[in-house]
Amino acid sequence: MDLVKPEEISHPPMDQLQGLEYCIDSNPPWGEAIALGFEHYILALGTAVMIPSILVPMMGGDDGDKVRVVQTLLFLQGVNTLLQTLFGTRLPTVIGGSYAFMVPIISIIHDSSLTRIEDPQLRFLSTMRAVQGAIIVASSVQIILGFSQMWAICSRFFSPIGMVPVIALTGFGLFNRGFPVVGNCVEIGLPMLILFVIFSQYLKNFQFRQFPVVERFALIIALIIVWAYAHVLTASGAYKHRPHQTQLNCRTDMSNLISSAPWIKIPYPLQWGAPSFDAGHAFAMMAAVLVSLIESTGAFKAAARLASATPPPPHVLSRGIGWQGIGILLNGLFGTLSGSSVSVENIGLLGSTRVGSRRVIQISAGFMIFFSMLGKFGALFASIPFTIFAAVYCVLFGLVASVGLSFLQFTNMNSLRNLFIVGVSLFLGLSIPEYFRDFSMKALHGPAHTNAGWFNDFLNTIFLSSPMVALMVAVFLDNTLDYKETARDRGLPWWAKFRTFKGDSRNEEFYTLPFNLNRFFPPS
């Protein structure tokens, strides 16, 4: 047997992912683009419905209030997605709600000045205004860091080895929203997971008139089948005598969104009244803004990879963070009960469909805005059981995590230093947030429990985020352990040309602003 030569089994690093049908600036035919945009819209509904469904009842709101918040959040998702794809990073990213904001928001909900209000509707409005005020003030963090280019300066300390744990945990860190939620209704969650894998992977070469229809629309095909199956189970009375929580997770008629939704409703700023401002609430909310900044930074790099673009230069990253801050400000003004962050599941769908086109995401933003104003039609799609979304998350979150691991190709993984940094960062990025979650479940408060509530919320929010913990550990270790002698091992030569906008000719192709706006905002 002949010896295998190393060059025959090695895989040279590639700064652009190969194998996509359409990259960031190539567009499918209009019909296909519209259908793919609708698929991204359907996927974005999961977060848009789940966050208000958790928070609104805690605030004293009814089903009508929940529908208005869902519509408002969906409307702002569309607006912020358009802003990001036009003027921000210009990557094909959906900007959705962020779970990072739930800790400070729940703290505001339990504020003694609000819980003493007896009238549920008045308590809901008062709490909403307090949340709005905190989000409006906290949004200034990302606006300042982004548009002042301070985040560009910070991101120059990020090497491939330092970003691997951050991007990987952008996906892996969401494991509790995957199969643990599928397990709440296995009879519809497991079939959805299996069908989605079969359609997107095993049947991806099935073509109709030379078009890979199953691969492109695996999500919609599987969703239609399982949603119809879930409706049959509901109509047949399969859940009639099951516990209430099981019915919430499995039935297709439990959300009350359709009956509570108006036919037409256009969200507008300050629709809940004038926001109220509290320094403690605002400071705690700033932690959530910092977390969404880190999570979005990792997600932007993953999106660039799955859109077959080059790594975004620091200037572009900072610009995107600035516009995300504008989006958080709009969320506060409109009252969405959430800030903004890049939707990780929609990034995963770029890889699943092999379509990284910017136009597709802009079309999906149009669907979000349109259906948020047509309440009944939007509520129809929003009534899909969340278990179905969780099944898809199991695949898409894992795909995004693997994109993070793919950055190891630029580094020397025969280096004990690099093995130490990656391993410790990944482990602590999973272990520390899990400790904070377990502690909170048992003690009903986080490990940080002092007399200063804002300080508790700040620390608990920071350390509940896996990408945040991973970034602190990985970037610190990477920039303090033999950093001068190991530039090549860290992968810095590969990213050197992407540190400035003009360092690579492809940057101009992928990241130049439209309408010749680069004249007024020259890249650094």
From Swiss-Prot:
InterPro entries: MetI-like_sf (IPR035906), NCS2 (IPR006043). SUPFAM superfamilies: MetI-like. It comes from the Eukaryota. GO terms for molecular function: transmembrane transporter activity. It is found in: Membrane. Expressed in cotyledons 10 days after imbibition (DAI). Expressed in the minor and major veins of cotyledons and leaves, in the shoot apex and pedicels. Expressed in the root meristems, root tips and lateral root primordia. The chain crosses the membrane at residues 41-61, 69-89, 91-111, 133-153, 155-175, 179-199, 217-237, 282-302, 359-379, 380-400, 419-439, 457-477. It is a multi-pass membrane protein. Keywords: Membrane, Transmembrane, Transmembrane helix, Transport. One of its GO terms (cellular component) is membrane. It holds the Pfam family Xan_ur_permease. Belongs to the nucleobase:cation symporter-2 (NCS2) (TC 2.A.40) family. This is Nucleobase-ascorbate transporter 2. The lineage of its organism: Eukaryota, Viridiplantae, Streptophyta, Embryophyta, Tracheophyta. The gene is NAT2.
